């Protein structure tokens, strides 16, 4: 950048002392130092931001590569599962049907002309239908206790009457 040695800096200081004088030199030196420090901080911030952008760009490319690899793995797994499911359906249909080999030649899957259910539909138990509104509306008791939430609301007068000692209670009159 600039080749400033000790001798050149001393020469600049002497010239500044002669030109500015001893009264204004400290103030100008402070201002110059502050401006120089500000410029250094700005340059360091720009360098840091550029390096951050370079790292972010590298991370983005790594992210896209990773997502692509994950998609490829997912697709191969799904293809293998579909192939094994087709084999299982074919074996199931051949074992269930009385003809044996005639069902193995038929197309498999939900569009099968034989109307035979697949192994997956037979094995799956019908799901119980529940009222989801009731399930979502219920707050667990442990949560109510932990948050000190009242389960039964009582008026102030009823609470005072409930906790008043028997000696201070008024006798109840009937008729």
UniProtKB/Swiss-Prot annotation:
Spans through the membrane: 1-21
Protein's name in the database: Sec-independent protein translocase protein TatB
Comp. bias intervals (Basic residues): 160-175
Family as reported in the entry's similarity comment: Belongs to the TatB family.
GO terms under cellular component: TAT protein transport complex
PANTHER family linked: SEC-INDEPENDENT PROTEIN TRANSLOCASE PROTEIN TATA, CHLOROPLASTIC
Keywords: Cell inner membrane, Cell membrane, Membrane, Protein transport, Translocation, Transmembrane, Transmembrane helix, Transport
UniProt xrefs under Pfam families: TatA_B_E
GO biological process: protein transport by the Tat complex
Localization, UniProt: Cell inner membrane
Keyword Oxidoreductase in record: no
Main subcellular location: membrane
NCBIfam families: tatB (TIGR01410)
Gene3D superfamilies: 1.20.5.3310
Functional summary from the UniProt entry: Part of the twin-arginine translocation (Tat) system that transports large folded proteins containing a characteristic twin-arginine motif in their signal peptide across membranes. Together with TatC, TatB is part of a receptor directly interacting with Tat signal peptides. TatB may form an oligomeric binding site that transiently accommodates folded Tat precursor proteins before their translocation.
Biased composition (Low complexity): 96-115
């Amino acid at each position: 950048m600039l080749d400033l040695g000790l001798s050149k800096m001393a020469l600049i200081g002497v010239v500044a002392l002669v030109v500015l004088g001893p009264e204004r030199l400290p103030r100008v030196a402070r201002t110059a130092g502050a401006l120089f420090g500000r410029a250094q901080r700005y340059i360091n911030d720009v360098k840091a931001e550029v390096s951050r952008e370079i790292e972010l760009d590298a991370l983005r490319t790594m992210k896209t590569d990773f997502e692509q690899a994950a998609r490829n793995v997912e697709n191969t797994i799904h293809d293998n599962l579909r192939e094994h499911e087709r084999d299982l359906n074919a074996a199931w249909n051949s074992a269930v049907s009385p003809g044996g080999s005639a069902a193995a030649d038929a197309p498999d899957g939900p569009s099968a002309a034989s109307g035979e259910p697949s192994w997956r539909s037979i094995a799956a138990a019908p799901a119980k239908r529940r009222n989801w509104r009731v399930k979502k509306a219920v707050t667990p008791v442990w949560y109510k206790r932990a948050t000190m939430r009242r389960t039964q609301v009582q008026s102030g007068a009823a609470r005072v009457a409930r906790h008043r000692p028997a000696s201070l209670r008024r006798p109840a009159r009937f008729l």
